[in-house]
Structure formats: C-alpha cells, structure tokens
UniProtKB/Swiss-Prot annotation:
Pfam families: ATP-synt_ab (PF00006), ATP-synt_ab_N (PF02874), ATP-synt_VA_C (PF22919). This is ATP synthase subunit beta. InterPro entries: AAA+_ATPase, ATP-synt_VA_C, ATP_synth_F1_bsu, ATPase_a/bsu_AS, ATPase_alpha/beta_chains, ATPase_F1/V1/A1_a/bsu_N, ATPase_F1/V1/A1_a/bsu_N_sf, ATPase_F1/V1/A1_a/bsu_nucl-bd. It catalyses: ATP + H2O + 4 H(+)(in) = ADP + phosphate + 5 H(+)(out). Keywords: ATP synthesis, ATP-binding, Cell membrane, CF(1), Hydrogen ion transport, Ion transport, Membrane, Nucleotide-binding, Translocase, Transport. It comes from Clostridium botulinum (strain Kyoto / Type A2). Its EC number is 7.1.2.2. Belongs to the ATPase alpha/beta chains family.
Amino acid sequence: MSNLGKVIQIIGPIIDIKFDSENLPDLFNALEINAGDRKVIAEVEQHIGDDTIRAIAMEDTEGLKRGMEALDTGKSVSVPVGKEVLGRLFNVLGKPIDGAGEFISEESYPIHRPAPSFEEQSVEPEIFETGIKVIDLLAPYEKGGKIGLFGGAGVGKTVLIQELINNIAKEHGGLSVFTGVGERTREGNDLYYEMKESGVLEKTALVFGQMNEPPGARMRVALTGLTMSEYFRDQGQDVLLFIDNIFRFTQAGSEVSALLGRIPSAVGYQPTLATEMGALQERITSTKNGSITSVQAVYVPADDLTDPAPATTFAHLDATTVLSRSITELGIYPAVDPLESSSRMLDPRIIGEEHYEVAIKVKNILERYRELQDIIAILGIDELSEEDKLVVGRARKIQRFLSQPFTVAEQFTGMQGKYVPIKETVRGFKEILEGKHDNIPESAFLFQGTIEDVLKKAQQMEI
C-alpha cells in the first residue's frame, strides 16, 4: 500500500510534509511530490515531532503548494548504472539531460551506500601510471587514491582532465565518470562538446548539478557520480572519477544546513562538515576487484588554505597537482608546478630507489635554479660560476622536458600527443641529470615525449 503525506509548508527548497505517525518515511528516503504536470523529487532530512518530516528538494520547487500529495518511495534516490551510462549526460536523479533520446538501464543503485569494509579494501599501494611525465615523475598518483587539482582560471585544468580520461581509456582500457558540482553550465557545455570532438566521450559518463540548481541537487550530485563509479569498480574496472569542484559540495551542504536550522560552526560552515566529507571520501577507494581513483578540483576561497572547506579536503588527499600561471607564461604545458605539487607515493619503498633519486635530484636542481634567477636578473648569467652555469643549463632543459604534447589538444597544437611510460620518463631525466645531453639545445626538449624524441628533434635542427 502506498504511503502518502500532505505538504504543509514550503520555504524555498525546504518542504515540510505530514504523514501518519506510524508511517513516517525513513531518513534519506526519496519522496515524489505530485505537482500536476510534473513530479518533484525531495529527500527526507529530518523528523519533526511525531508525524512531520522535513525534506530538501532535488529539483525546482516552482509550482508547489500546500496540500499537495507526497508519495514515500520507500528507498533513497536511485540512479542508473552499467555500461549504458557511458557517453551520456545526467542530472542528480540519473535522468539524461543531453537530449540524445530515450535511456534504458537494466540496473540502478541507491546513492547512499556504505563504504567498502576493511576486508574488501586493497592494502598494497600501487602507482597509477598517467603517461604524463611531470605527474608520474614528481607527484605520482596512487591507484584508488585521491588527488587534489589546484589552479586558477585558464591554466589548463580542463585539458589535463581530458588527457587523463583519454590516457586511462586508451592505455588501460579504463572508464571515467565526470561529476560537475556547482560549477558554470557554460563550462559543462564546453566540456561535453570538447569531449565529443576529442573522442573520449564514449568512455565517460557525465553527471552535472550546476550552479543554478537547488542546494539539494548540488549536495547530492557527487554521490550520483560516485555511485556510477562504484558499479564499474565492482565489475573489476579501474575508474577515474573527476569531481569539479569539491568546494561546491561543501558549499551546498552549508546552504542545506542553514535552511534546516542547524547552528553554524567555524566560518559559518555546517557543524557536520567533516562527517559529510568523510562519508563521500571513504567510498572512493580500491577494493580487491577494481579501483576508483579520484581527481578533485579544489577551489580555495580567497586563497586561504586554512579555510575549513579546503582544510577538511586536504586531510583526505594522497597527492596534489598544482597548476601555475607563471609556468603558462613560459609557454610550458601542462603547467604543473614541479615544486608545489606533492604526493605521498614519492617513497623509495613504493616507486623504487632509482625513480625516487631522480625525482629528488630534479626537484633540487629546479629549486637551485629558482634561487639563481634573482642573480641572473640583476648581474646576468655570465657572472655565475661554471658549476652554477651547468645547473642553470640542465634545469632549463628539465623544465622544458617536463612539457608534453597532449592527444586531446592535437587539433589546436598540430603536434601528435605522446603517452610516456614511467620507465622512459625516469630514464630520460636521469640522462639529463648525468649530463649526457648537455650539448643539445634547450629548444629541442620542448613538447617532446621520450628522450629519443628529443634526440630526433636535435638532429632535425642541425640539418
């Protein structure tokens, strides 16, 4: 028998509904409110008194009024999962919003699910090879790890994300789920068409809950994307989950918390900030079947890293990739800052002695070059000692060798994209550090894949 209630109060996206006291819906149950020509989905957040629940709408509440009927579905919001979701674009409720025709999925999962138990989780730290030299060498990703992607507007976050999607699809046969949380609709639209053009769309599912949507949708859309990823992981796949932007997840939670009347905590954030973040992040993990590796774009409000939202996110991250405007000004792409980016995988016990030594030496030489730049700016390079001149020469070659042509940017750059295995990356940088290529001009190192490509370019330049 269906369990019906009546809407008794609506304040923006918050809806109070009266049920029989013995048939009160459970927390997180989805409710369908019949608004005549459409059904509005809301999620139960609080029980008020004996017979009333407070729900948050997942869709626009326009047209709702008191006295309307609400049906308790008896389960939480469920979204479609399976290979059918690839190449399609969904909203928080798992409804397609790409206008690409009817969508039929055989299976659906609830968005609220427990995290894998300790027994199910994989404990062996394993490197996730991206084929992008600067990441693999200096701040490697962990399979099933969480990576923070930091960078302002226009420094190449989207292109880096697309290249990662392309590389996992083509080199590892893996899949990707892109979750747009509270960002601009225009950016989502651009991403969709760019993915279509670069040919990575059929290996990706996209889930959007953008800036103009109610806070309930923005708060839950990350769980929708995560649920789709979990299905693929449980089928033995390696999945790449992108969350853009994790700050908006916290921001939406803060709005909902205030609307529900909870007393705010530090800087006006919700008192449950750490719990909500933990519930999301704990589900992103490797199991013995497969892995979910997540790359999360992190907006830092007013560049304050001590703000509770980014500070809570940091506690969960295994690696950080920092994109820097000063590197884009040098014309080096991807504009990953080799000194600011970090990873807990940079450990000789995980990556091996050789890789570790090369990475540390590369960081040291770039650090020394940064120190010498002031002297060069004032006195000129001729005033440096012979040893320092050698350091500067090698550092500039390393800096350029950290650049790389991307497959997804081929149509703009005219350069064929390169995927570089970790072994080749380590070998190339080791040879530069050993001085084997001191006689090769700097320009030969720019936008090349392996060290062999550099040697070929140098030969062409001589002709």
